[in-house]
């Protein structure tokens, strides 16, 4: 008999995965590029933050989510099929998100979608722009097809203003994206919603360009694996 394994166990090897760098795809051309920024403290910082969050959760919350996934009928991927499953999902996401401004980043067996704040939200707003709904609709189609993943939605801000305000705004934005995807039929049990405030920048906050990059919401897709 098979069962869903502890999906958070991946944190034990996260350091090795992040150290190996990641592959990203241009948000407009869809062409593959290896990003030095994505290594270490770059784009990978967001994925690393999510992995650390999962690793530090208490056992009761982990077990509760596993029960919720099972109750919702969410299946798991056989160990040998994880790579192919995530490759297929990545290919569809790249196709759907070409020319949208959303970056697709591959980190080992995880996929990270980076949604820049300027196309997702108005300034200081926690509500998704209506103009971004179509992009989220495209994401939802793929998430619905590839349901054997946890969806960690994390909000990030720049360092301008009070840290408490930035924390609240990051939480509101992450919730807003997650709630929209839920409204498109994505199973609630798959979501973890996290606000990181200004703690995990991917660019230098001393420049306007860097601050713009740091204002973002990320979706980290984590495969749900089976064990014998």
Language-model features: where?
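Short, low-complexity, glycine-enriched hydrophobic/amphipathic alpha-helices that associate
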Residues: 25-92
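N-terminal Sec signal peptide cleavage junction
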Residues: 20-22
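Amphipathic, membrane-active segments
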Residues: 86-118
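Periplasmic OmpA-like peptidoglycan-binding domain that tethers envelope proteins to the cell wall
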Residues: 156-228
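Bacterial N-terminal signal peptides
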Residues: 10-18
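Stable alpha-helical elements in mature extracytoplasmic
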Residues: 46-47, 89, 93, 132-135, ...
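Periplasmic peptidoglycan-binding/anchoring modules of Gram-negative envelope and division proteins
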Residues: 96, 121-155, 182, 212-214, ...
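Bacterial N-terminal signal peptides that target proteins for export
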Residues: 1-11
């Amino acid at each position: 008999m098979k069962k869903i394994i502890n999906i958070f166990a991946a944190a034990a090897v996260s350091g090795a995965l992040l150290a190996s760098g990641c592959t990203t795809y241009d948000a407009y051309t869809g062409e593959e590029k290896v990003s030095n920024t994505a290594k270490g403290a770059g784009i990978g910082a967001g994925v690393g933050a999510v992995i650390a969050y999962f690793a530090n959760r208490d056992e009761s919350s982990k077990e509760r989510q596993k029960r919720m996934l099972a109750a919702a009928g969410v299946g798991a991927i056989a160990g040998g099929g994880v790579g192919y499953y995530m490759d297929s999902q990545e290919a569809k996401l790249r196709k759907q998100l070409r020319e949208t401004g959303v970056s697709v980043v591959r980190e080992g067996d995880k996929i990270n979608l980076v949604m820049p704040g300027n196309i997702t939200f108005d300034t200081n707003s926690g509500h998704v722009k209506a103009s971004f709904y179509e992009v989220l609709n495209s994401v939802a189609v793929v998430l619905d097809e590839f349901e054997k993943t946890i969806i960690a939605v994390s909000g990030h801000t720049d360092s301008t203003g009070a840290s408490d305000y930035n924390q609240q705004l990051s939480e509101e934005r992450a919730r807003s994206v997650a709630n929209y995807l839920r409204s498109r039929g994505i199973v609630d049990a798959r979501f973890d919603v996290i606000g990181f405030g200004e703690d995990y920048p991917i660019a230098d906050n001393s420049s306007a360009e860097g601050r713009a990059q740091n204002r973002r919401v990320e979706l980290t897709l984590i495969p749900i694996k089976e064990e014998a």
